[in-house]
Every structure is written in structure tokens, then in C-alpha cells.
Amino acid sequence: MMEVLVLGSGVVGLTSAWYLAQAGHDVTVVDRQPRGAEETSFANAGQISYGYSSPWAAPGIPQKALKWMLEKHAPLKIQPSLDPALLSWMGKMLLNCQLSRYQVNKSRMLAIANYSRECLKALNQTYSLDYQGRQRGTLQVFRDEKQLTAIEKDMQLLAQSGVRFELLNVAQCLTHEPGLAPVQEKLVGGLWLPDDETGDYYLFCQQLTELAKQQGVRFHFDCHIQQLVCEGKKIIGVQTDLGLLKADAYVVALGSYSTSLLKPLGIEIPVYPVKGYSLTLPIIDEKFAPQSTVMDETYKVALTRFSDRIRVAGTAELAGFDPAIPEARKATIEMVARDLFPHGGDFAKGQFWTGFRPMTPDGTPIIGATPYTNLYTNTGHGTLGWTMACGSASILADVLTHGESPLSRLGLDLFRYPKAS
């Protein structure tokens, strides 16, 4: 057994703490917020999207990005900047848009997602967490025939990875999401992913925090992390505003903030904050609300059903750590909701939110060892934090405890990047 400090209490940090504790370690979680999941894990889409696990870096994206620059409601926005971190990240992302790299990255992401599904299933079977979860799948809807044609290659990868799916015509889409009936003329078909789930991300994190406490995990909230202190290639502590915290091993699970903490150690990880937005609406008419998750392929916006709310989330904006919510981004999110489910939610009572998704240029998280003998990472999950959280945490616990995991062959640690250390 080792004493382990987990830095970060979003869904990835919390699940890391849980699986490390289950492996027999003495775990403490450190976070600057007063409770877990107060930042990127707070109000995102609420999807557990095993079948939709796919990198943003894909064939055709460079051309689409140029087109999107001129569109009002584009799914990707780039704020002009000479930030070296942004330029470097974008360059790496462009390289990963090659078909061969996309296929490798998507296969790797699907493997993590499928493993994570089994981990979450086992967790729920044992502890019966209640987070307004629904196991009713994801419906990816298409607005033009080109999207239907383009999805064929993804379907091949889904089949190879053992992910269940079904290509649907519009009438079949309505059997899963009858609330789309008033706008069916806008659609040409859809892809049904029956094993996907939804739920209140924040509620899941709060319940897991309490469960972890019962298992002996300690939490230092309202504790600001300043730097990692090392001697040679070993970490000897974490300097915080509460003093120097020491352990046998350290896990960096700080999402987009992992990069700045690791950089003084000479560790360069390509994790960039890709800003996302959400709108939460009270449901006013259930028959016109989504039943599970509807993913609008045109605008890359997800509409997810909770018990009495609709969560509309999407867009990707490269703007650093700017916390502002521009009216233009609000307009895009609201437009998609009004376009697909105009009568389902109370737009007058809608609440907007933004968060910083920790995105890698290849879409795959960075899980595992570092050049420092007792330092580990679990970050870079992008839009798939909850989807991959339990599996990633289990992988991390295996690597920290045994030196490898069943998925080590995938090359998930930072050493897959030539200049990571």
C-alpha cells in the first residue's frame, strides 16, 4: 500500500481516487474548489457516449474549419492568437487529421470507452448510485445526405470495436425520439447507439465523493496547489497554501490545468483548454423533449435528457482560459435547442455555463507514468471525461500498482508524444 495524492476533484480525479483506494492505497484528494466537480465537470452534456467516442481531429476537418470561420453557428471557433501553446497544439491536431492516424486514435478511444463502460456498470451494480441515469442510447441525427455517406467509415470502426449501432431512416429515428416529430422534415436519418447512457454528471461526482469518504479517501478542499517539488527524478511533495503535502506517489488529474503544473518539471503535455458551452432548460412538455441524448451532427451540439431538465451542450472554442460566455455562443446553443425541440424546454428560465475541456490533439487521454518515478497523469479526456473516467481511473490504478494495465499496449501515457519529456 502507498500513500497517494490525487490532484484534482473533477470526474477524472474522483474516479482516480476511488479506484486507487479500491486497489488498497491510502488516498488523499486535493482541489482548490470547496467541493468536487465545480469546474469542467459541473454542467456539461451529461453523456456517457461509448459509441460516440471519436477524435475531433478527423479527415476533412481542416477544410471544414476554414468554412466554419465564416459561419455564424459553426461548431468550432478559433480566437486569433499568437499563443505558442495554441499554435503548437493546432499543428499537432492537423497532423492527426490524416485518415491513418484518425483510425488509430478512434480505435484507441473506443477501447478505453468500452472498458470504461464495464467499470461503470460494475460500480453501479455494487453501489447503485442514483444520478438521474438513463440507459436509452444516443441518436446522432443527420441533416444532409453527405453526413450519411461520411458515417460509413465510422460504422466500420464501430463494428470492429464491438460497438452496437443501427443506421436509421427518419421514421425509425422518431421511434426512439418522438419529440423530433414536429421537425422531422429537417432530418435525413440517424445513427442509433443503444448502449450509450445519460445522467447528471455533477450529481454522480457528489455521490462518488461521499462513497469515497466512506472508503477512507480524504479530501483537502479549498486548497490551492502551487507547485510540485522534486529531488532529481522523484517528487517529494506538493506545495500548497496549506503547506507541503507529501505522499509516496502523485497523480495529476487537473484537466486543462495539468499542463502548467507539469511544465516547470520539464514535462510538456499537449493538453489545451477547448472551451465548451451549455444551456440547461426546465422541461415544460415531456412529449416534446428528448428521451435520452440527441446529437446534432451539423452543429456538434448534444441535447440530453435529465429527469426534469434538458441539457444542451456543445461547440468548441479555442480561446485559452477566457471564462466569458459571448452572446454569439449562447445564440448557437439556443438555436439548436429551438430548432430540434422548440416546445420541450422553458427557454425563459434557461441557464448558461462554460467550461474548459482538456483536449489532446489526438483525442486520447494521457494516462500513466512520467519521467519522474512516482508521478502519474490522468488528463486530456476532452469531451469524453465521464465516458472514459472509470476506465481511465482503473487503468491508472493498475499502472501505479502493478506497472502496467490490460490496455497498456495502446500507448496511453505521455511517452507517445516525442517532446513530452
Swiss-Prot record:
Needed cofactors: FAD
UniProt GO MF annotations: D-amino-acid dehydrogenase activity
Pfam families linked to this entry: DAO
Keyword rRNA-binding set for record: no
Gene3D superfamilies the UniProt entry points to: D-Amino Acid Oxidase, subunit A, domain 2 (3.30.9.10), FAD/NAD(P)-binding domain (3.50.50.60)
Keyword Transmembrane helix attached: no
SUPFAM superfamilies with a match to the protein in the record: FAD-linked reductases, C-terminal domain, FAD/NAD(P)-binding domain
EC number(s) recorded for this UniProt protein: 1.4.99.-
Catalytic reaction annotation: a D-alpha-amino acid + A + H2O = a 2-oxocarboxylate + AH2 + NH4(+)
Top-level taxonomic group: Bacteria
TM annotation in the entry: none
Listed pathway(s): Amino-acid degradation; D-alanine degradation; NH(3) and pyruvate from D-alanine: step 1/1
GO BP terms: D-alanine catabolic process
Keywords tagged on the record: FAD, Flavoprotein, Oxidoreductase
Broadest EC class assigned to this enzyme: oxidoreductase
GO cellular component: cytoplasm; plasma membrane
Name of this protein: D-amino acid dehydrogenase
Annotated gene: dadA
